[in-house]
Amino acid sequence: MKITRRSLLQLAGLAGLGIFVPACREMFAQILFSPDAPLETSPPLPQNPFRAGSKSLVAIVRGEEVPRMVARAVDLIGGMARLGVAGARTLVKPNVVWGEPPPTTTDPRVVRAVAALAKAHGPASLAVGDMSAVLSLPTRPHLEKTGIAEAGREVGAEVLAFDEGEWVKVHPPKVEYAKTVYVARAAHEAERLISVPVIKTHRSASFSCALKNTVGCVHGKNKPWAYGNDGWEPAVAELNMAVRPHLFVVDGLQSMVQGGPWSGEAVPTGIIMASGDPIATDVVALGIIKAFGRWDMVTSKGVWDQVQIRRGIALGLGAGAPDEVELVTDDLTGGDPHFVTLLADIRRNVGLH
């Protein structure tokens, strides 16, 4: 972890505050101290069951009724039964970076729909959990404020704040930056991990969707900023060697197309996406952001040229080229011309035919 003079001054300020403010003590501990965690084996790369031949499927569904959109998106890529949730410890992981409404955080309606769909397939256990950004800890108040905790409780899921729980230590293979990673035990032990990210721009990581959402499963010592400016974006991809979701259901009801991750310009996109491939998911999300033309960190380069994407491909995390991605779509509204235009923009920006 690179510590600059400015960072040291900031940490000193946090330390002083930590004497008086419990929340600051938690932030300070996450930044400076490694947890007492047992060494575990890094998870294997899960087989993507949501494929058509050699292509990773990415579903995009336009609609108005969130549960129906979520169910349809998952059905389009093969259905929840393909995931093997039955009898498995299942964790739904939204984006709860802090306590602001969507699209800063995942819409609780999407979380509820995903958790309910998983529960209908008979998991051994079901939880909804995340850890907020270090500077906004603790997580529990944000889970409550966003409505995500209530969404989980409504379907009978346990609601977890990872900063309250235990950690394990893993040494991911093939990485350059994230060589020792502390992972929330709940995420490490989940037999089926369903990531429910949002689509948004990001001032440090360029963009945030599938790969970036995994960062909420790791300790403060492993947040991407801990690896310095050069390591920020590649570390996002590398952390997916320590935590490996099995399914991505993306909240695209709104998309942040400028600013982020805390706040920014949001536009209504009215979609849900689903895929088993984080790279395929992210290039499609980038295609959406790029279509609005507001964020230079995305518009200035091709979607396959983003650092997160290049590093993820090198690590074998998913699709490596446009001919390895297939879009499957549905419009439940009966014919939205804006959706037709958006799909055309996505196909052009991702290089799909």
Task: Indicate where each model-derived feature is located.
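N-terminal and secondary-structure boundary signal
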Residues: 2-353
